[in-house]
């Protein structure tokens, strides 16, 4: 078992990861003693792992779980209300711990419910998708979507623990695995050139779900995320770099309809748009763009946006991006493999050219 600490003072917490972790109840003990426990999961994950987790936690006071529909299109206030209703109907108070068993949607909704219910209760992340394991479960971003924008309603609220069972990836559909790899690749682009090169050299090992390769990749991503969050918890500075590709990507998700493109797919296409924008500003040369595209393609990820989207479609959604400051669009752009920056003065003319030529 490996452990990484997210250092946030009194709100610090561990990320633990290994194979077969979900069979080990002792990792939960310190957080669940004398607590009521409500597991939140979805219709896809429940048949795979709910009973297993309930069995491991049988010595604790687990109440009836909440099983949500599966998909980004259900990441709404309406669906989150079912968590609140369950808490209230079961007369659960502040001595309750929520456990998010699932991917990013389950984790985001459970975390936001924990932040909101009775002004804050504890929660634990048990991410079952690659994307959630390397990104969304760590750092305390919790939210639901709005028809006008992704993750627009939410809070920063840290979990008590993140427990990553790498064996969960054995039941992950290939398309979902590829979507998670988009976020893995992102870390190499913005932070760690050696890690990017390692990914280029270990494509087949990762695609075959080699446990050693997955353990290293997930661990490195969590190390980077923990370091960034410790330096900038509420995204006032360096944490914004983690949004590489997301401004374009969120526009794709919102325009196409949540769930049509997986989040990681939209991030991959958005990252290529960001790389081409950086190339157009002479921040990087074309060889770097080609390396980024080649690595995304190796994991069967899209490298261009939907044909149906034009510049006007993108810019309408991008103007609502959470990084917009005083009405000015701010884009995360690569400056090299392993380095990125935030840019405010990107002309509409360049963006239109990049999108039109994609």
UniProtKB/Swiss-Prot annotation:
One term of GO molecular function: metal ion binding
Cofactors named for this entry: Co(2+); Zn(2+); NAD(+)
Annotated EC: 4.2.3.4
Annotated pathway: Metabolic intermediate biosynthesis; chorismate biosynthesis; chorismate from D-erythrose 4-phosphate and phosphoenolpyruvate: step 2/7
Record keyword Acyltransferase present: no
InterPro entries tied to this protein: Dehydroquinate_synthase (IPR050071), DHQ_synth_AroB (IPR016037), DHQ_synth_fam (IPR030963), DHQS/DOIS_N (IPR030960), DHQS_C (IPR056179)
Residues annotated for NAD(+) binding in this entry: 70-75, 104-108, 128-129, 141, 150, 168-171
Keyword Cell division found: no
Catalyses which reaction(s): 7-phospho-2-dehydro-3-deoxy-D-arabino-heptonate = 3-dehydroquinate + phosphate
Subcellular location: Cytoplasm
Residues annotated as transmembrane: none
Comment on bound cofactor: Binds 1 divalent metal cation per subunit. Can use either Co(2+) or Zn(2+).
Record: residues binding Zn(2+): 183, 246, 263
Main localisation: cytoplasm
GO biological process, one term: aromatic amino acid family biosynthetic process
Keywords: Amino-acid biosynthesis, Aromatic amino acid biosynthesis, Cobalt, Cytoplasm, Lyase, Metal-binding, NAD, Nucleotide-binding, Zinc
Any Gene Ontology CC annotation: cytoplasm
Signal peptide: none
Role, per record: Catalyzes the conversion of 3-deoxy-D-arabino-heptulosonate 7-phosphate (DAHP) to dehydroquinate (DHQ).
HAMAP family, A to Z: DHQ_synthase
Family: Belongs to the sugar phosphate cyclases superfamily. Dehydroquinate synthase family.
Protein name: 3-dehydroquinate synthase
Organism: Shewanella sediminis (strain HAW-EB3)
């Amino acid at each position: 078992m490996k452990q990484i600490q997210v250092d946030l003072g009194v709100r610090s917490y561990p990320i633990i990861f290994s194979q077969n972790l979900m069979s080990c109840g002792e990792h939960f003990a310190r957080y669940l003693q004398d607590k009521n426990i409500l597991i939140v999961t979805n219709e896809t994950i429940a048949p795979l792992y709910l009973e297993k987790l309930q069995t491991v936690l049988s010595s604790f006071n687990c109440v009836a779980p909440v099983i949500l529909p599966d998909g980004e299109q259900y990441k709404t206030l309406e669906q989150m209300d079912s968590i609140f209703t369950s808490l209230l109907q079961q007369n659960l108070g502040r001595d309750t711990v929520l456990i998010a068993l699932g991917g990013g949607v389950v984790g985001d909704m459970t975390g936001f419910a924990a932040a909101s219910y009775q002004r804050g209760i504890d929660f634990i992340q048990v991410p079952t998708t690659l994307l959630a394991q390397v990104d969304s479960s760590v750092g305390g971003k919790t939210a639901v979507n709005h028809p006008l924008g992704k993750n627009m309603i939410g809070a920063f609220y840290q979990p008590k623990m993140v427990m990553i069972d790498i064996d969960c990836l054995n039941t992950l559909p290939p398309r979902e695995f590829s979507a998670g790899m988009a976020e893995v690749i992102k870390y190499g682009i913005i932070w760690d050139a050696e890690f990017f090169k390692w990914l280029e050299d270990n494509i087949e090992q990762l695609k075959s779900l080699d446990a050693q390769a997955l353990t290293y990749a997930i661990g490195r991503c969590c190390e980077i995320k923990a370091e960034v969050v410790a330096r900038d918890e509420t995204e006032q500075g360096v944490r914004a770099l983690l949004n590489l590709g997301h401004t374009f990507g969120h526009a794709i998700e919102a325009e196409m309809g949540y769930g049509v493109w997986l989040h990681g797919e939209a991030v991959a296409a958005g990252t290529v748009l960001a790389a081409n924008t950086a190339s157009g500003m002479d921040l990087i040369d074309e060889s770097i763009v080609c390396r980024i595209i080649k690595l995304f393609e190796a994991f069967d990820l899209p490298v261009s946006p939907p044909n149906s989207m034009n510049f006007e479609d993108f810019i309408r959604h991008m103007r609502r991006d959470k990084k917009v400051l005083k009405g000015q669009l701010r884009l995360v752009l690569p400056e090299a493999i392993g380095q990125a920056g935030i840019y405010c003065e990107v002309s509409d003319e360049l963006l239109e050219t990049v999108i039109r030529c994609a």
